[in-house]
């Protein structure tokens, strides 16, 4: 059971509510507090047996470093799109690995799956319905999940083959 509070609680609420669920051994509690409350997350993490997952609303390696150094996170859920791209995501994943933390990236199955293939501390790939490039109709060829395993592309790099016509339809005039 993986729980997500979507930044809804105070530290005290997160501790008391998660403690009520701990007899059921939840795997993690995701985003229990607003994302800029590093000290609160640290307090929550120290008070619980349940792992704390955070990262989808953290936007740089510097913000994530603060979480990691403060002992405020167990599972890093960095989002390559929100964090500044592939290079920034990889820096965060390797920083997490240096502190023996696993990564479970947020959003965009196709890109996140490829990134997980390149790091030693990969944990799990999230598949949000409606939140993949394939679901958005932006791919020539969708990537598949079979028996719970994501199948990476045989193409080099991230392996994503975009549908150029679909991308043209997303242009915005500035």
Task: Give the location of each predicted region.
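Flexible C-terminal active-site loop/helix
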Residues: 106-174
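Catalytic core of soluble alpha/beta enzymes
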Residues: 1-106
């Amino acid at each position: 059971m993986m729980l997500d509070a979507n930044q809804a609680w105070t530290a005290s609420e997160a501790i008391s509510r998660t403690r009520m669920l701990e007899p059921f051994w939840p795997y993690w509690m995701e985003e229990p507090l607003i994302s800029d409350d590093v000290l609160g997350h640290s307090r929550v993490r120290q008070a619980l047996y349940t792992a704390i997952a955070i990262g989808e609303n953290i936007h740089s390696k510097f913000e994530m470093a603060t979480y990691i150094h403060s002992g405020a996170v167990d599972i890093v859920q960095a989002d390559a799109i929100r964090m500044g791209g592939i290079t920034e995501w990889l820096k965060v994943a390797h920083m997490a690995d240096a502190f023996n933390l696993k990564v479970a990236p947020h959003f965009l199955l196709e890109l996140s799956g490829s990134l997980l293939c390149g790091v030693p501390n990969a944990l799990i790939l999230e598949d949000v319905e409606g939140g993949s490039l394939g679901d958005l109709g932006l791919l020539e060829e969708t990537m598949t999940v079979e028996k719970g395993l994501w199948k990476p592309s045989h193409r080099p790099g991230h392996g994503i083959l975009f549908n150029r016509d679909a991308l043209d339809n997303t242009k915005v005039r500035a």
